[in-house]
Design a protein with these regions (language model features):
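Gram-negative (and chloroplast) outer-membrane scaffold detector with strong preference
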Residues: 60-139
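Short glycine/proline- and aromatic-enriched beta-strand/turn motifs that initiate or cap beta-hairpins
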Residues: 27-69, 96-98, 103, 176
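Cleavable N-terminal export/targeting peptides
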Residues: 1-37, 177
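Low-complexity, intrinsically disordered Gly/Pro/Thr-rich segments
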Residues: 149-160
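Outer-membrane beta-barrel pore domains and translocons
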Residues: 43-49, 74-76, 101, 119-123, ...
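Outer-membrane beta-barrel "beta-signal"
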Residues: 94-100, 164-177
Length: 177
């Protein structure tokens, strides 16, 4: 497994520092990270999968006060110049997700949501956990870690290699509808 480049580590550190600072700021009772049934979250941010940088875009829909389903598209930059073939398509993965939200069970402040769940994608399937912090009624931040356990679809063994067995870290912004 390749190590993260120093630039990627620094960017991740910046995002985590920003998230930590915002968590320490007094929050408004109006902002809610998890509204329960019918809540829709759209999120976008930086993604790092096994040392490869990229981005992700996703959405969650709350089926109940505790359970949500959604989808996410992740792209990481895949460079493979040695074989002279275009490998850019290998960097994409679309996943369906299911999460359990712990905010009510753990009696967390309304601006904070901790969740865990599963994801099944075109490239890999695995487990995930994350946290959301809303600093306003509409906008917030998120951080998520996903461990891709197994390769899912595709005949080409190389397609699964980008995601299979890799840890994915992501941070970014959320919008509540």
């Amino acid at each position: 497994m390749k190590m993260m480049r120093n630039v990627d580590k620094f960017r991740l550190f910046q995002w985590l520092l920003l998230l930590g600072c915002l968590l320490c700021v007094p929050h408004s009772a109006q902002a809610q990270a998890w509204d329960g049934e019918g809540d829709i979250k759209v999120y976008a941010g930086y993604a790092n999968v096994g040392g490869k940088s990229g981005m992700e875009l996703g959405s969650d829909y709350a089926l109940s006060d505790f359970v949500s389903v959604g989808g996410q598209l992740t792209y990481v930059n895949v460079k493979d110049y040695d074989e002279g073939r275009d490998r850019a398509f290998m960097g994409y993965d679309f996943s369906l997700t299911g999460n359990y939200h712990w905010a009510e069970v753990l009696k967390l402040p309304s601006v904070l949501d901790i969740y865990s769940g599963v994801s099944v994608g075109l490239r890999a399937a695995g487990l995930q956990a994350g946290v959301r912090y809303n600093f306003s009624e509409t906008f917030g931040l998120y951080g998520q870690v996903r461990q891709n356990l197994v390769k899912t679809f595709g005949n080409d063994v190389e397609y699964g290699r980008v995601y299979q067995g890799k840890t994915a870290l992501s941070v970014g912004l959320t919008v509540t509808f």
